[in-house]
Each structure stands twice: as C-alpha cells, then as structure tokens.
From Swiss-Prot:
Tissue expression as described in the entry: Seems to be expressed only in testis.
Official protein name in the record: Putative BPES syndrome breakpoint region protein
Species for this entry: Homo sapiens (Human)
Length: 116
C-alpha cells in the first residue's frame, strides 16, 4: 500500500478502504490527500509551513472518473501550472471538497504529494 509518507493510488472499483471510505461504483483514480487546517490562501488550499507528519486518518479520499480532464474553473486556472504540491487543505467531509479535488487531480501530481 505504499509508505506512510507517500500518498498512494488505491483506486479499484468498489473497493472499501481502511479509512472507511467507499469508492463509487465506476472506474476511477482514488487518492488520499492530507487534511490540513483551512486558511492557507484564504480558500482552504495551500502549502503548509510545518514539517509535522500527519496520520493517514487525517487524509481525505479523492476520486475522479477516468476520461478527459474536466475544465478548470477560471478562478483556479493558475493551478494547472503546478505539477506537485506538498499539501492541500480541504474542509474534511465537505462534498465540495470532492468536487474541487476532482477538478484539480488532472493537473496536480498527487503521487508526489507528501504527508507533512
């Protein structure tokens, strides 16, 4: 399943993950992103300044159906220039978090996203 310090792609159809999440019943990529306090950049997105390790329980699951990448909203158009991030902060369990992360996933290299 990969090391504790590495976000791991665990996407397989209908899989229930150790953290209690269930993947939707369609082909997808599933990622676990560190949940960090909102307030970075005022939008809940940002790169944290601390080097603390966070447990995998502090992650949110991100799933996106396979296929063409959706178009980024204009307010996020700058994000497509970022190949990897060391942290993303989302409101945990907020459905809008999933929407945003699904939009970002084609442009952000979540495989390089580290738990901080």
């Amino acid at each position: 399943m990969g090391g504790r310090d590495q976000i791991t792609n665990l996407g397989s159809e209908g899989e229930t993950h150790p953290w209690g999440y269930s993947s939707p019943p369609y082909p997808l990529h599933t990622f676990f992103i560190p949940f960090l306090p909102s307030g970075f950049g005022g939008s809940g997105l940002g790169i944290p300044s601390d080097n603390e390790k966070h447990d995998l329980q502090d992650c949110v699951e991100v799933s996106r159906p396979e296929g063409p990448a959706p178009e980024l909203p204009s307010s996020l158009c700058g994000w497509n220039k970022i190949s990897s991030l060391c942290g993303l902060g989302f409101p945990s369990r907020d459905p809008k978090t999933w929407d945003l992360a699904m939009l970002l996933s084609p442009w952000v290299d979540f495989f390089e996203l580290q738990l901080l």
